[in-house]
């Protein structure tokens, strides 16, 4: 069992991986008892983005706050609080903050997707 608060989770800078103005916090994963998946909280600063990329695992996203776009398989999808998305394995995608405040979203991946 595990209960935690986002304010107590360290922020990990994602810019060394090619992102701009991006950080993640690992909320729940194997260390908390969820063996097969990891729930991360991603934050994109104003004008921040993830790199255009793909990988061999899917992920599920839920937007907590802010606005942006998800470019997936050549199509642009608007993001706002309450938006959910499923990104299949091996599909090119990129998250971009287009708003005037941070874009925060949950990203759930299999454990092999958390590096």
Go through each PLM region and give its residues:
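Ligand-binding loop in jelly-roll beta-barrel domains
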Residues: 89-114
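A short, N-terminal "cap"/entry segment at the start of jelly-roll beta-barrel domains
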Residues: 1-36
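Histidine-centered metal-chelating micro-motifs
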Residues: 49-51, 69, 85, 89-95
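Short, conserved beta-strand element in jelly-roll/cupin
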Residues: 41-45, 55-70
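Short acidic-glycine-tyrosine-enriched beta hairpin
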Residues: 75-89
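Conserved short histidine dyad/triad with adjacent acidic residue
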Residues: 25, 40-55, 89
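Structural motif
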Residues: 67-69, 76, 92, 102
